[in-house]
Amino acid sequence: MNKTVDRPKDRIIRSQHVKLGTKNKMGQTYTDINTMFFEVEREPSFMTGSEVIRQAVKVASVGTSVAYPITPQSEAAALIGELYAEGYLEEYFRGESEFAVMGQCAGAAFGGHRVFTTTAGPGTLRAMENFPMWAGSRLPIQVCVTMRGINSPLSIQPDTLEAHYLLETGMLMWHAETAQDLYDFILKGFIVAEQPDVHIPIATMCDGFFVTHTKDTVMLPPGDLCLPPYDPYKSPVPCMDMECPPVRMMRDPFVMKSNYISYSTHASWQQEVRAAVERSRKHTIHLLDGLIDVHNIDRDIIIVASGTAVSQSREAIRLLEEEGIKVGLVKIKTIRPFPHEEIKEATKRAKHIFVPEFNLAGWLAREIKAIVPNNERVIAGPHVAGGMTLPCEVIVEEMKKYLGLEVAHNQ
């Protein structure tokens, strides 16, 4: 098991926009984040991932949510609309398209609201131009990406390929294994993204249907508590003021003045966005108890995975151990920032590192191969795509084939 990290209470800068202990208009009490995340007693609830998204938004003091329906996030977007009808959000409306939604989210964030939206698959790709714009504008918007197939022929089923496209947008990227992860990541994601030394958008990702439409037991804090709201005055860049825009780039591109100014501006700002991702590490480690979880990493064979591939790997490991094959596990929680040093340390003894994924590109295996010494140890796969499940028996069979072990005919 992992060693619990120290959690000094002054590590995270919280909003001082409201006084803790006071109530919002819905009667929820603004609660210290350390108390809400680590101290209050939680009660079990049995619900789908979409319902979990609703519950998280209900206590997150979200100001604006913009929606556009696309499976498998449509239900979550509709449930957030119910929260608006009940009075928990200040603004909620449906955009004209996924591209429009992300632009409208930017406007709300420029105006100082905490902003949450959801998307999936082709919607993510249609909205893609906005994500690096969010990052470059230092907008701490949260988008919940309920990942699904993006290829033709059309598939609405789970596939994590869209995460590959998001890797270089400048956003934080956290990948939830379970509905519990998803709930916690949504709430903690706001806090990390809004830190003054970070202040960039975050994609909280989960595997569509496997998480969004499957019921699971989730431990929830009391619904009469809520996070302190976003404090736009903690932003490292000026808030948007429609009477006095903070910078002329909104109306007058740098390239109109000088190519050199344009080049140097973009180069330095891209470096700053990436530096902000790196600065998020200390806050993320504090709130998520590390960027990875590890189990039995002293073994010669290790599986490294993220999302629901972790769940399938756990059962595959159990089956392998019944045959006397001992395998360790590394669960990756954050894709950006990527846990470079943690993975190198966790896999340093391994002779074989398997990376099962719900996509054919093998983007996670590529990330791992790029950082570990002797990367011939990294075996990309097994892979499934387009909504195929990844049975634990398939993981077992493919691992045994690679290791030159006998494969049972009934597998």
What does each of the following model-derived ranges do?
Residues 8-179, 187, 207, 376, ...:
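Thiamine diphosphate
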Residues 48-53, 278-301, 314, 318:
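Glycine-/acidic-rich phosphate or pyrophosphate-binding loops and their flanking alpha/beta elements
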Residues 123-126, 148-152, 181-182, 210-212, ...:
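Short gly/pro/ser/thr-enriched loop/turn and capping motifs at secondary-structure boundaries
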Residues 154-156, 273-289, 304-312, 332-339:
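A general structural motif
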Residues 173-237, 352, 356-358, 394-411:
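Structural signature of the thiamine diphosphate
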Residues 201-293:
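Conformationally flexible catalytic loops at phosphate/diphosphate-handling active centers
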Residues 316-346:
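Generic long, charged, amphipathic alpha-helical segments
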Residues 356-411:
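Peripheral docking tails and interdomain loops at the edges
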